[in-house]
C-alpha cells in the first residue's frame, strides 16, 4: 500500500529537556524559574550544576516577588526539581 508524499521525508528534531538545561549551563545564561504552587514568587540565577532529577544548583540566585517586585539575594542555592514548573532564559 503506497501513501502519498512518501518520497518526501520530514525529519523531526526533538530537544531533550536535559540538553536545554545543559545549554543554559554551558552558555552561563541567567534563567528564571517558576515555582510549583508559588505563583507570586520566581527564582533567578545562573545554573552551575544539575542532575537527572532536575535538581539545580544556581549561583547569584535571587528570589523575586511578583506583586511587590522586591528582590532578595540568596547567593548559591540548590533548588529541588520537584519545585520547578518552568525554566526560561532572561536577559541581564
Curated annotation (Swiss-Prot):
CDD domains reported for this sequence: Sm_E (cd01718)
Annotated ranges, domain Sm: 18-92
Listed SUPFAM superfamilies: Sm-like ribonucleoproteins
Matches recorded under InterPro entries: LSM_dom_sf, Sm, Sm_dom_euk/arc, snRNP-E
Pfam families per the UniProt record, alphabetical: LSM
GO biological process annotation, one example: mRNA splicing, via spliceosome
Predominant subcellular localization, coarse grouping: cytoplasm
SMART domains linked to this entry: Sm
Keywords recorded for this protein, A-Z: Cytoplasm, mRNA processing, mRNA splicing, Nucleus, Ribonucleoprotein, RNA-binding, Spliceosome
Gene3D superfamilies (alphabetical): 2.30.30.100
Molecular function as annotated in GO: RNA binding
Entry GO CC: cytosol; methylosome; nucleus; pICln-Sm protein complex; precatalytic spliceosome; SMN-Sm protein complex; U1 snRNP; U2 snRNP
Family recorded in the similarity comment: Belongs to the snRNP Sm proteins family.
Complexes and interactors: Core component of the spliceosomal U1, U2, U4 and U5 small nuclear ribonucleoproteins (snRNPs), the building blocks of the spliceosome. Most spliceosomal snRNPs contain a common set of Sm proteins, SNRPB, SNRPD1, SNRPD2, SNRPD3, SNRPE, SNRPF and SNRPG that assemble in a heptameric protein ring on the Sm site of the small nuclear RNA to form the core snRNP. Component of the U1 snRNP. The U1 snRNP is composed of the U1 snRNA and the 7 core Sm proteins SNRPB, SNRPD1, SNRPD2, SNRPD3, SNRPE, SNRPF and SNRPG, and at least three U1 snRNP-specific proteins SNRNP70/U1-70K, SNRPA/U1-A and SNRPC/U1-C.
Its job: Plays a role in pre-mRNA splicing as a core component of the spliceosomal U1, U2, U4 and U5 small nuclear ribonucleoproteins (snRNPs), the building blocks of the spliceosome. Component of both the pre-catalytic spliceosome B complex and activated spliceosome C complexes. As a component of the minor spliceosome, involved in the splicing of U12-type introns in pre-mRNAs. As part of the U7 snRNP it is involved in histone 3'-end processing.
Name of the protein in question: Small nuclear ribonucleoprotein E
Encoding gene (name): SNRPE
